[in-house]
Amino acid sequence: MRTVEYAPGRSADVYGTPGPATALLWHGTQTDSRAAVQILAQALADRGLAVIAPDWDSHAPDGGRSDLLASATFAQQQASGAGLVIIGWSLGGVAAAGLTLRASELNVVVTHTVCLSGAFWADDPISGGVVQSGAPAGAVPTPFTLLTGDADDVVPASASIEFAAELRVIGWPAEVIDLPADHGSIAGARYVPDEDRYEAADDPQTRNVVDAVAELILARTGHSGR
């Protein structure tokens, strides 16, 4: 892993060597918490999918939009123009959906989007509004894989189920898969109550969840065995 600047003063961790198989992995609401998803990022890189995991600030005046778009531009450049896999956790999943639906307007090429416990009732940091408002006319549908945790007490599976239904109405393919995970472990993290934050977790149970998530991502995005 190496740390780079994707924009002045803004950091991202790069796992593997970006190229045709590259994912952009956005953490959740917690400001500048790229380290929280390092276990998942490394698991994906170990399987051949390079990962760029940037910091972003959901509490910035623009809701993190400038960070998110700058990181997407950086990832696209690092991938030599190849299409990106976009992975987002919690609010990052909402942002991933928002970027994907408007990718043609934002000059980003997205091949597949994976949302981990996406909090789809929250405002989309990309558009600043409801992500379910739909894609621009003429947008090419991108496949979505929505992963939920059966022990998630923060974001219910119904959020992903309802969002998937709304995607299908506008002709975008969407699959929902429920896993034995909680809100943190689905992204390789644990919640620290005393500090009210998430951090990376490498305990055996979380590792098992991460392995399952990584295998699903590789299988659904067509990068298995690379």
Regions found by a protein language model. Name each.
Residues 73-135:
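Primarily recognizes the serine-hydrolase "nucleophile elbow" in alpha/beta-hydrolase
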Residues 170-226:
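C-terminal catalytic histidine-bearing segment of alpha/beta-hydrolase fold enzymes
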Residues 1-18:
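N-terminal cap/lid segment of alpha/beta-hydrolase-fold proteins
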Residues 20-28:
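Short beta-strand element of the alpha/beta-hydrolase
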Residues 118-170:
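The feature captures the conserved acid-bearing segment of alpha/beta-hydrolase catalytic domains
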Residues 45-61:
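Conserved alpha/beta-hydrolase
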Residues 60-79:
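Alpha/beta-hydrolase active-site loop
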Residues 30-41, 56, 158:
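The serine-hydrolase catalytic nucleophile loop
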